[in-house]
Design a protein with these regions (language model features):
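Bacterial N-terminal signal peptides that target proteins for export
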Residues: 1-13
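Bacterial N-terminal signal peptides
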Residues: 13-23
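Sec/Tat signal peptide C-region and signal peptidase I cleavage site
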Residues: 25-29
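C-terminal and late-domain segments of enzyme folds
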Residues: 31-84, 95, 99-100, 111, ...
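Extracytoplasmic/secreted cell-surface and envelope-processing proteins
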Residues: 67-70, 96-104, 141-144, 165-176, ...
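ATP/NTP phosphate-donor binding region
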Residues: 69-78, 84-149
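Flexible gly/pro-rich beta->alpha loop and the following alpha-helix that scaffold active-site loops
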Residues: 141-188
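Catalytic nucleophile loop
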Residues: 160-161, 184-204
Length: 392
């Protein structure tokens, strides 16, 4: 029989680090657990944060260089202040503890004072008592009591990049999914970058058959590589249930990888068939004159969309931030079809008229996610898989 798991404490070059080791089988051949756990700071510290948060908070980060201010914003929205303590948890399916020092310290010399240097969050100076990373690489790990106990106690959760197919395969239908949705119901701040962003919408591009380029998606909206959430689509088919992103599918690395075409295709796939228009298997209406309409959000690299509720659970606003040294505008795009696609079927190029796009390219404007207003929109059309004008 395997011996009990033990928690070992050690101090090393990056500061106080807790590492959970599962004891070896008596043969010494295998670890008892597949997950990996890393922490900096004191994860056992007692915190003094109210568990009655008033407003939901989310971060959609577009990949590439992480946006320092987005992490600071999450920490503040969690109710963390100097002296309160606070537990910031990173979730991922692959990788290691790379986020721990970045979020906790204010610089490469492990300083814990303000102001933080560029490229560092300064979480300890803001009040965090720990940053913990859990690598959850399979369904057994996602059901593990220790993994879920760490996440349950989190004051903020951030889902790293990687491959969203791993998150869907390993976490959906597990205790970890339930734990995350419980945190969302408690209004604990949750964010994600790249693949982590991809699972925050009600609908997910699951990438179960790999990724797809815009040109391929527009040419065949039913390409086998387009795997969206569950099959068939269902309002409960996504991994997470964040009310801010109802009827929404998200995408990252947006301008850099030219993903407008595939996001328009993903959104079109959500639109239900009716009177000869729409997409087979879709379950949502097109937006004009309808509630709960199909929509999409595309976030550029080195940008983050900060989303906040008003406390009612019904109204959400968003603001885009980026690092001061980021080149270019790093915009966020909000996409919705005003009409159902007139051609959306297997092996046929997509045709959809009156796709409305709104571009948020500054950090001062507030976008209203509840009624899709705040910046002016423009209209593009897709005819036989081709845009009639630049969608950017």
């Amino acid at each position: 029989m395997p011996a009990r798991a033990r928690i070992w404490w050690r101090r090393c070059g990056i500061g106080a680090v807790w590492i959970l080791f599962a004891n070896m089988q008596q043969s010494g051949a295998a670890l008892e657990h597949s997950y990996r756990y890393y922490a900096v700071g004191n994860p056992g510290a007692v915190t003094a944060i109210s568990d009655q948060l008033q407003r939901s908070a989310f971060v959609l980060m577009g990949g590439g260089k992480d946006v320092d201010e987005a992490f600071r914003w999450m920490i503040r929205k969690a109710g963390v202040r100097p002296g309160t303590g606070g537990k910031f948890v990173i979730l991922r399916a692959t990788g290691s503890e790379g986020y721990n020092a970045y979020v906790y310290y204010s610089g490469p010399d492990r300083r814990t004072t303000l102001p933080p240097l560029d490229g560092w969050t300064g979480g300890a100076a803001l009040g965090l008592s720990s940053v913990q990373t859990l690598v959850v690489p399979d369904r057994a790990a996602a059901d593990d009591p220790f993994v879920n106990s760490v996440v349950t106690e989190a004051d903020a959760v951030f889902i790293a990049g990687g491959d969203q197919a791993n998150y869907i395969r390993y976490w959906q239908g597990t205790a970890l999914q339930q734990t995350l949705n419980t945190l969302l119901a408690k209004k604990v701040p949750v964010g994600g970058t790249s693949a982590g962003l991809a699972i925050l919408g009600e609908f997910n591009f699951a990438a179960l058959q790999g990724t797809i380029k815009s040109s391929r998606a527009l040419t065949n909206p039913f390409d086998p590589r387009i795997t969206i959430g569950s099959d068939p689509l269902s309002p409960s088919g996504g991994l997470l249930s964040a009310p801010a992103f109802a009827s929404t599918i998200t995408d990252s690395h947006f301008v850099h990888r030219d993903r407008m075409g595939r996001l328009v295709t993903f959104v079109a796939r959500l639109v239900a068939s009716e009177d000869g228009a729409g997409c087979q298997g879709g379950i949502l209406p097109a937006s004009e004159g309808s509630a709960n309409y199909a929509r999409g959000i595309g976030v550029s690299e080195q940008a983050a969309l900060l989303v906040q509720g008003d406390g009612t659970g019904e109204h959400f606003t968003a603001r885009r931030v980026r690092n001061p040294w980021t080149k270019g505008h790093a915009p966020v795009y909000f996409v919705r079809p005003l009409e159902a696609p007139s051609q959306c079927m297997p092996a046929k190029p997509l045709t959809v008229q009156r796709v409305e796009i709104r571009k948020l390219a500054d950090s001062g404007t507030v976008f209203n996610l509840s009624d899709w207003t705040g910046v002016d929109g423009y209209i593009v059309n897709v005819e036989e898989g081709m845009f009639d004008t630049s969608p950017y």
